[in-house]
């Protein structure tokens, strides 16, 4: 019975984490934020009206 419980337990590998133990959701949020900043900088150079002033 103990072997069945161990086999059915969630695996550590099933958790969404990078090799540095950072949750992937946080990693994706950081990437999205960085890309948005780059897009805003590019947009500001072309069309100043689309700049975000945060």
From Swiss-Prot:
It comes from the Eukaryota. Expressed by the venom duct. Residues 15-40 form a propeptide. One of its GO terms (cellular component) is extracellular region. It is found in: Secreted. It holds the Pfam family Chi-conotoxin. Keywords: Cleavage on pair of basic residues, Disulfide bond, Gamma-carboxyglutamic acid, Secreted, Signal, Toxin. GO terms for molecular function: toxin activity. InterPro entries: T-conotoxin. The cysteine framework is V (CC-CC). Belongs to the conotoxin T superfamily. This is Conotoxin mr5.4b. It comes from Conus marmoreus (Marble cone).
